[in-house]
Amino acid sequence: HHQGVDHPAQVQTAHIEDWMHDLAEAGLSASTRARHRSAMRQLFQFLVAEGELDDAPGDRVAGPSLPRRLPHTLSEADVETLLAQPDRTTRLGLRDAAMIELLYATGLRVSELVGLRQDQLHDGWLIVRGKGSKERLVPFGDEAAVTLRQWIGVMAQEAVLKGPCPWLFPGRAGRPMTRQNFWERLRRHAKLAGIQAKVSPHVLRHAFATHLVSHGADLRAVQMMLGHADISTTEIYTHVARARLQRMHADHHPRGQ
């Protein structure tokens, strides 16, 4: 109920702009205001679809500008330290090592990682079922492949005794490991390895993208591997690419030094 408005049909663009301004004045963050605006737009689009309104006034109001911060990431040295931490001579250590190797090699979302089935694994490739049931092909390198082969060997031995398991990384009772369980195990390995930086599955996903771009990968290719529907989501990594170009210029241009 705002400024004498009794029915959605009375809402004008100016009303929504005032409301957005009020939210900002109330101290709500840009991301929270963006969520409010999104909910409001969905409501109006629903009313248009139902024939209650002719058009949706919220579509004409610009959203709050969100800060394009590069997410927290890990250095390549930190990742190497983390990968060296799990004891690969034990079953759980080998499983954890395979999961961390694969996460860093592919940039999967944690839900995609813990939900992997053995039949999604092909020679050097994963078929990933991501958001909205979209499938994408993601390659992985030799280091991850070696650890995965060792882990699959263990799984094959267990299948002889217990019967086959469809999951690549089963937790208790043969079901997929929970995201929380993997998160906790990852954090514990990071702590034992003495890594000061914050470590989470999402941080490793960002490390995958950041390190790829800093070594010259194309943003479109990174977008495809991450499963971003929109390139704008991947564009947070552009300044990593710019920094790399500056280094290349300094190293190779005769007047770069």
Regions found by a protein language model. Give the residues of each.
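Conserved catalytic core of the tyrosine transesterase superfamily
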Residues: 1-257
